[in-house]
């Protein structure tokens, strides 16, 4: 039994050693092959690289290529047809093959036309300068490889080396030149086709999933994945900056939507939202269906976070969505944010502050008392204050959530918090929003009127500042549109949303 166990151990150890030896052999062979290739083709590659750098420095890269191609074609015809090569016979493959590669190199000089076609799709030469440099490097390297191929028979004659061996060496150099030229041509063609495909897809497809589309492009074109992604990002960014495309980061990744198509679809949906005062999540989902052709996960996430025609409000019966068209028919507890429908008579002045319960009123009063209490007095009574606050855990928790996240949305807590910050900075600041003047400023800081909107997303924070009926910006001061204050983490999205509104003429200039 012990002998069997010992034999198994030796067998396993032997296999492990053989595996290590095989890996070492493969690594050694790879390194040796790489060294041989470097010795064979490295000088030609280095010469091509140096030539490209020098001609680029003097801005004669294309012109030098033209002269080199003409000279190469003349020499190739002299070798192939007139038999001027000492070691090559005329009208044979060995002498005629150079005509083929030189003609192919001449075709590569059409690169300015290729670049012009690429530019028509939105890519500039600066965007692909690295690829153009590599293209010319391949062009010049191919000529040096052809020169090595032509010199191989001469070396065999001069140094009495086996003609057969040098013939294979010359053929290897010529094949390397041919492959180099074909690879360069395929790369510039793939680049042109890629830019055309991206532009055409953006024109034809109103909705695209970024990740799946990029993966498809990387699989379809023989370009490095990093280059494909860079070209793709460049063209996408251009259209987003021009307002032709919108990007949404949703549950299953980023989605790209044609802006005009999106606006048409959402305009119709926002009109439907005006038909009822509020919608439950299921009612909203049924109404919206999948009008943007998103995946189910992305569609649900869009409804939850990205609708800019209204916002979610916490009613006593649950969370409901209300169009900004009906927002004046609501009243919101200044303490906990609870919302209810309030059909006030026309020209009725709303209450400066409304509380849904005596508990919320007591909480707000207590917070104000603590804020106004002198620091030393607050410290001395900290224990008592703590006991009082402990009596109101549920309401306090709700308030704290609203303070921290912006709550459902009009910035009652944000007005006061930012007001305190401005006062600490020695700015002349006061709160105006408590008088609830229609379309009035919330705060006045050093003579600047500021409207505060703290909703759950940037689109909703900005959307809450626009009229639900005509879509125009509601808050106009004596000096033009009032400044809009949103949460810090929504700033980038709010700027993009406001830029779109301005582009659509929704903000009046004075």
UniProtKB/Swiss-Prot annotation:
It is a multi-pass membrane protein. The keyword Transcription does not apply. Residues 23-30, 83-94, 158-164 are periplasmic. Keywords: Cell inner membrane, Cell membrane, Membrane, Transmembrane, Transmembrane helix. GO terms for cellular component: plasma membrane. It is found in: Cell inner membrane. The chain crosses the membrane at residues 2-22, 31-51, 62-82, 95-115, 137-157, 165-185. Residues 1, 52-61, 116-136, 186-510 are cytoplasmic. It comes from the Bacteria. This is Inner membrane protein YeeR. It comes from Escherichia coli (strain K12).
């Amino acid at each position: 039994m012990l002998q069997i166990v010992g034999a198994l151990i030796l067998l396993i150890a032997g296999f492990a050693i053989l595996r290590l030896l095989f890996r070492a052999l493969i690594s050694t062979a790879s390194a040796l092959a790489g060294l041989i290739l470097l010795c064979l083709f490295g000088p030609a590659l280095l010469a091509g690289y140096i030539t490209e750098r020098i001609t680029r420095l003097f801005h004669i890269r294309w012109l030098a290529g033209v002269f080199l191609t003409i000279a190469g074609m003349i020499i190739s015809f002299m070798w192939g047809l007139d038999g001027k090569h000492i070691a090559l016979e005329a009208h044979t493959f060995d002498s005629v093959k150079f005509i083929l590669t030189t003609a192919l190199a001449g075709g590569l000089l059409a690169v300015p036309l290729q670049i012009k076609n690429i530019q028509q799709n939105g890519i500039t030469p600066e965007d692909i300068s690295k690829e153009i440099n590599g293209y010319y490097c391949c062009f010049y390297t191919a000529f040096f490889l052809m020169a090595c191929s032509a010199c191989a028979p001469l070396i065999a004659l001069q140094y009495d080396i086996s003609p057969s061996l040098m013939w294979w060496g010359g053929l290897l150099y010529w094949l390397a030149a041919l492959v180099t030229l074909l690879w360069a041509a395929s790369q510039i063609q793939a680049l042109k086709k890629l830019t055309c495909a991206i532009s055409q897809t953006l024109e034809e497809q109103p909705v695209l999933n970024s990740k799946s589309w990029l993966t498809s492009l990387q699989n379809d074109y023989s370009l490095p994945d990093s280059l494909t992604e860079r070209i793709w990002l460049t063209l996408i960014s251009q259209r987003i900056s021009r307002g032709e495309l919108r990007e949404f980061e949703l549950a299953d990744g980023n989605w790209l939507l044609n802006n005009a198509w999106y606006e048409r679809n959402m305009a119709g949906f926002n009109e439907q939202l005006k038909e009822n005062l509020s919608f439950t999540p299921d009612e909203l989902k049924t109404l919206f269906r999948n009008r943007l052709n998103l995946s189910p996960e992305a569609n649900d996430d869009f409804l939850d976070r990205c609708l800019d025609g209204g916002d979610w409000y916490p009613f006593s019966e649950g969370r409901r969505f209300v169009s900004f068209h009906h927002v004046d028919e609501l009243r919101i507890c200044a303490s906990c944010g609870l919302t209810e429908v309030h059909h006030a008579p026309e020209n009725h002045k709303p209450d400066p502050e409304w509380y849904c319960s005596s508990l919320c009123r007591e909480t707000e009063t207590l917070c104000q008392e603590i804020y106004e209490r002198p620091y030393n007095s607050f410290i001395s009574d900290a224990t008592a204050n703590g006991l009082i606050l402990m009596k109101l855990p549920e309401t306090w928790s709700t308030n704290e959530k609203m303070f921290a996240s912006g709550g459902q949305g009009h910035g009652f807590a944000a007005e006061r918090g930012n007001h305190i910050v401005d006062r600490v900075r020695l700015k002349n600041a006061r709160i105006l929003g408590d008088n609830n003047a229609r379309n009035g400023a919330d705060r006045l800081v050093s003579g600047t009127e500021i409207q505060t909107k703290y909703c759950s997303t940037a689109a909703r924070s900005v959307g809450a500042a626009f009229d639900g009926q005509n879509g125009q910006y509601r808050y106009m001061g004596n000096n033009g549109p009032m400044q809009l204050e949103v949460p810090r983490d929504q700033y980038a999205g709010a700027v993009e949303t406001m830029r779109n509104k301005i582009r659509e003429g929704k903000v009046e200039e004075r």
